[in-house]
């Protein structure tokens, strides 16, 4: 009986197996849905594994600390977290005029391009010529709702409306160091006289003959005698402890020769037929010859001689104080420009006062004495001198510093200009263009402690200069003599 009962139980178990299998194992579609919904539990030693952004923050919600572990970088973590928390606030491109958007939590920040401001860079800033010269390379003029840039003679305004492109090989103010620039077609020679103001009567000049022996021009008379030495300022302006100005580095330098062929004053080339100098130089000789392109007067290899046609001396020149110490020499034949002979650029009055004379340094050059009571230099010397504020300038001098003058030089360093440099250029460079800012005028000794060189302030005479140099345009041919 027992064996029969055991057999019956075995048969019953085998008959029930298919039904049990169908209850234990799910169909494939149901099983797949179940697996897709299953979340991963933290595995063993997970805290010791390197971060993974997909595992930490995409498969399940993460904390900022976990995101930092995944990125291992604070900036990347912040960028991710700002979007992760509440979406990308920059997706709508809220920043105008090329501004850059940075997402935040519940907000965003726009970094605006220059000239724009506001939360969305929606406001266009009003540019001012008083701030960085309005980004102009040369001249800046206020206009309605902004500024307008323009360029010096022989330059073209760039496509960006700010830069100035040299219009030829020998554009003004470019020495041999700054000549390797992009060139453009040179427009016809012309001068704009409309934008300059001047505190001085434009017609205040006296035209002199080429033979001006014993002539000192004042407001009252052209027939005064030669200036006598007294307790007046000394026209001993001078380049002391300067360096040699190599060929082409001071191409606007002119040298005035007396009737014996000796150099006695300097000058600045303004145009093919006009040279700027000091009024006090005019009474020092019977005849004047102008030399350009020379750097070594002992060799006489590179210079060109030019005869003088007319000389214009400011009618208000005061020999006793050197006020209005400015004159213009008109040549009989035009200067032939080259790499070594180039005019200095003439600035506008505003540009000179607000930009150039607020630079740290100016450049003075000449053939004058290299030390007080020393010999004149055979080679052209150049020195870089700092501008001196007006209050310091006036306190340092025993003589009047008028509104038509400014000081430059060092308080203690032995660098200055010296006798024989009078009338020469004080140049200021701005964006690789060199502008005439002063005329070497007078000083108390040479490079003396606590004393500075005094210069005629060219910005006071811009219109006066232009009224003269526009009277005659240069001829198409030049005729010059060799030294």
Swiss-Prot record:
Q: Which cysteines are joined by disulfide bonds?
A: 57-62, 90-101, 95-110, 112-121, 129-140, 136-149, 151-164, 172-345, 245-250, 265-281, 393-407, 418-446
* Tissue expression profile of the protein: Plasma; synthesized in the liver.
Q: How does it assemble?
A: Heterodimer of a light chain and a heavy chain; disulfide-linked.
Q: Which reaction is the catalytic activity of this chain?
A: Selective cleavage of Arg-|-Thr and then Arg-|-Ile bonds in prothrombin to form thrombin
Keywords assigned by UniProt? Blood coagulation, Calcium, Cleavage on pair of basic residues, Disulfide bond, EGF-like domain, Gamma-carboxyglutamic acid, Glycoprotein, Hemostasis, Hydrolase, Hydroxylation, Protease, Repeat, Secreted, Serine protease, Signal, Zymogen
| Protein name per Swiss-Prot or TrEMBL | Coagulation factor X isoform 1
Where the record annotates domain Peptidase S1, the positions are 239-470
One Gene Ontology molecular-function label: serine-type endopeptidase activity
User: Which CDD domains does the protein's record reference?
Assistant: EGF_CA (cd00054), Tryp_SPc (cd00190)
Q: Which residues carry this modification: (3R)-3-hydroxyaspartate?
A: 103
Asked if the keyword Glycoprotein belongs to this entry, the reply reads yes
Domain Gla residue range list: 41-86
Q: Matching SMART domains, A to Z? A: EGF, EGF_CA, GLA, Tryp_SPc
Question: Pfam families from the entry?
Answer: EGF, FXa_inhibition, Gla, Trypsin
Propeptide intervals in chain numbering:
21-40, 183-238
Role description = Factor Xa is a vitamin K-dependent glycoprotein that converts prothrombin to thrombin in the presence of factor Va, calcium and phospholipid during blood clotting.
Q: From the UniProt record, report the name of the gene that encodes this protein.
A: F10
